[in-house]
Design a protein with these regions (language model features):
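Substrate-binding groove of N-acetylhexosamine-processing glycoside hydrolases
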Residues: 1-169
Length: 169
């Protein structure tokens, strides 16, 4: 398994070349700690892992959907990533991202414009206060009783610097 959007084939190739049998690739739908899944990252991860699986003659693809801290995203938001996995695991000719997103928008969601998945992908990157940060602040307040740590996290988020807030965790 590897959930990075820029995952390389190195580890899977080493396993395949070592004679390991029963290889599976396990990408993810990119919904953990997210209200709306990260669809571009899911496309990159799932398409790469599926391609590597085809190249290394993997027995299958296990597309994962899991969550941290309560799995806050609605299961319907994972459908797009699940469709990526279904399409790519059975067909080595992987569609370009824009085309499969258009097809999913039309076929799965009945969106005649073909733009719904692209809009959802924009929305998933608009969180001003990431769920992971909210959980860490809560833990700092309740578990560690570290009010200064929680205050620093809140300041970083209030200043719009979610990356700094997450880095301080």
């Amino acid at each position: 398994w590897d959930y990075a959007s820029n995952v390389s084939s190195e580890r899977l190739t080493r396993l395949a070349n070592s004679g390991a049998e029963h290889l599976y690739v396990c990408p993810g739908v990119q919904g953990w700690n997210q209200l709306i899944n990260k669809y571009h990252e899911a496309y990159e991860n799932i398409s790469r892992m599926a391609r590597y699986g085809h190249e290394c003659h993997a027995m299958g693809l296990l597309n994962t959907d899991w969550g941290d801290y309560g799995h806050i995203n609605h299961p319907d938001f994972s459908r797009i990533g699940m469709i990526y996995g279904a399409a790519f695991s059975w067909n080595a000719d992987i569609l370009p991202e824009e085309e499969i997103n258009r097809q999913i928008s039309v076929l799965e969601f009945g969106d005649a414009s073909g733009k719904l998945v692209s809009v959802l992908d924009l929305l998933c990157h608009q969180d001003a206060y990431p769920w992971r940060t909210a959980v860490m602040v809560q833990e700092a307040l309740e578990l560690h009783q570290d009010k200064e740590e929680a205050a620093e996290l809140l300041r970083s988020c209030a200043e719009g610097d979610a990356d700094a807030a997450n880095a301080s965790i």
